[in-house]
Amino acid sequence: MYGIEYTTILIFLISVILLNYILKSVTRIMDYIIYRSLLITVALFALTRAQNYGLNLPITGSMDTIYANSTREGIFLTSTLCLYYPTEASTQISDGEWKDSLSQMFLTKGWPTGSVYFKEYSSIVDFSVDPQLYCDYNLVLMKYDQNLELDMSELADLILNEWLCNPMDITLYYYQQSGESNKWISMGSSCTVKVCPLNTQTLGIGCRTTNVDSFEMVAENEKLAIVDVVDGINHKINLTTTTCTIRNCKKLGPRENVAVIQVGGSNVLDITADPTTNPQTERMMRVNWKRWWQVFYTIVDYINQIVQVMSKRSRSLNSAAFYYRV
């Protein structure tokens, strides 16, 4: 009798354990199915809703070529466009309502009133210290000046690319650049940068680390300086820290919601730092009109083609953004 009861209890316990194991197995299988389904759903959603960043098409100065549209239809209804121009333009036009007139012309191209913003800057040099590129699409007009070619090239390199930067403590540390994408960016009201390359014993190569006057000057009284030195060699750096800052930066890639339109000049400026590569002219364009009304009329005519070789981004850019990826 007791044997039967013990057997019954044992069978009952085994059944409970077996049932518990089956339930846990079913739960694990269901969890796997549910999580896998969620993962597939999220992946498909991300792919179907992903931002189209378009194509990096080279623009060699001519704006009469049709490019494949890399933006969504109706994008102008929800996008903003910023047009940056020098003070010279508004002075020459000398019309208090010229912006309203251009806004009406942009309206005929599909850009609603209020979606186009006009931003004035005093000079290329001043603009390079504090550019504020907040719109979905940003067009920067730069009047060609032979005496400012290098400033224009550096500014274009700065705003047409994204940079990830970190502060540099030049009083405590030596620094070296790791490759072509690694640069030191100096910004301020007046930047004079000197460097002293060091050998493996941390002795100066052609300079004395204790004598700043023996350092090699790579920038003098600049507001923006992108410094490139020999890769893989430590350098001691001297900088006018009271009027300037310097950051250790790595170029991450193109900032595709910015384009530069060069006004005048025989060729589009090449902003490539590497002399062995083809000129970098992505989103660099050129118009050759003498009068600013003609320049703006051309931009209105070709605005949609210009935007089609750009890509809308949600990240804004100001002077602090050169130090961080935003």
Swiss-Prot record:
Residues that coordinate or bind Ca(2+) 2: Q177, D228, V229, D231, D301
One Pfam family, short name: VP7
Domain of life (superkingdom): Viruses
InterPro entries in alphabetical order: VP7, VP7_1, VP7_2
Signal peptide: 1-50
Molecular function per GO: metal ion binding
Keyword tags: Calcium, Capsid protein, Disulfide bond, Glycoprotein, Host endoplasmic reticulum, Host-virus interaction, Metal-binding, Outer capsid protein, Signal, T=13 icosahedral capsid protein, Virion
Start and end residues of each stretch annotated as GPR motif: 253-255
Residue ranges of the region described as CNP motif: 165-167
Glycosylation site positions: N69, N238
Residue positions binding Ca(2+) 1: D95, G206, S214, E216
Keyword Signal in annotation: yes
Major location (coarse): virion
An annotated GO cellular component: host cell endoplasmic reticulum lumen
S-S bonds: C82-C135, C165-C249, C191-C244, C196-C207
Cell location: Virion; Host endoplasmic reticulum lumen
Free-text description of this protein's post-translational modifications in UniProt: N-glycosylated.
Extra facts: Some rotavirus strains are neuraminidase-sensitive and require sialic acid to attach to the cell surface. Some rotavirus strains are integrin-dependent. Some rotavirus strains depend on ganglioside for their entry into the host cell. Hsp70 also seems to be involved in the entry of some strains.
Record function comment: Calcium-binding protein that interacts with rotavirus cell receptors once the initial attachment by VP4 has been achieved. Rotavirus attachment and entry into the host cell probably involves multiple sequential contacts between the outer capsid proteins VP4 and VP7, and the cell receptors. Following entry into the host cell, low intracellular or intravesicular Ca(2+) concentration probably causes the calcium-stabilized VP7 trimers to dissociate from the virion. This step is probably necessary for the membrane-disrupting entry step and the release of VP4, which is locked onto the virion by VP7.
Quaternary structure note: Homotrimer; disulfide-linked. 2 Ca(2+) ions bound at each subunit interface in the trimer hold the trimer together. Interacts with the intermediate capsid protein VP6. Interacts with the outer capsid protein VP5*.
Family: Belongs to the rotavirus VP7 family.
Name the record gives this protein: Outer capsid glycoprotein VP7
Organism: Rotavirus A (strain RVA/Human/Venezuela/M37/1982/G1P2A[6])
Lineage: Viruses, Riboviria, Orthornavirae, Duplornaviricota, Resentoviricetes
